[in-house]
Amino acid sequence: MAINYDVRPVERNDVRDFVEQHHYSHSINGLRISYCFGLYDGDTLVGAMLYGGLAMANAWKKYGDKETDVLELRRLVLIDDTPRNSESYFIGHTLRWLKRNTTVKVIVSYADPNYGHSGVIYRASNFEHVGMTSPGRVIMFDGKKYHDKAVRTKYKGELKPFAKRVKQALDDGTAHYVKQKPKHIYVYRLRK
């Protein structure tokens, strides 16, 4: 089956609900997002992709000379009923758009084996596997997983209300840490 989708730059709010419904994380809260793309079948949104600054402070230094040289592919999600190779089609179109319309040099993405991902789609899109992250941990709270930095988020020097609730839950035993496997790191060079 031939892929006949349109790839369009969109605003964050155009894809927020779609990502929250279809991506395994069910969230884009807290993401630094620079570019958003929608994958459309006619007027129907069937996929979303979000690029932004790397989640880890100063991690960009491994890949570029300055922070603006590097973006992370933060979210990629398509509905299940798309033809084979739709993900690589979508990635390829967004990479070409970024190369034509930005000065970004490097795209970094992570494949999370904790969700059964090994990076097949990145290898199919000519990303280079450059290693693994360190093992991490998440916080299980109210039946959901949260990044362990959720207990450190501050606003004007004070812990945010949600961070206080999670910290209290850890203290009283209603939340707990769970170890995570290291993630695969993939890199795509847009330009030298």
Q: Model-found features: residue ranges?
A:
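A short, polar/charged loop/turn motif at coil->beta-strand junctions and beta-hairpin connectors
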Residues: 1, 13, 45, 65-67, ...
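Short beta-strand-to-coil "C-cap" segments at the C-terminal boundary of structured domains/repeats
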Residues: 187-192
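Conserved beta-hairpin
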Residues: 19, 33-53
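Acyl-donor binding region in acyl/amide transferases
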Residues: 6-9, 52-172
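Short, P/G- and charge-enriched loop/turn segments at secondary-structure junctions
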Residues: 25-26, 169-176
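Short hydrophobic/aromatic beta-strand or adjacent loop that forms the aromatic wall/cage
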Residues: 34, 181-186
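A short, compositionally biased
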Residues: 31-34, 133-134
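Short amphipathic alpha-helix that is part of the acyltransferase structural core
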Residues: 1-31
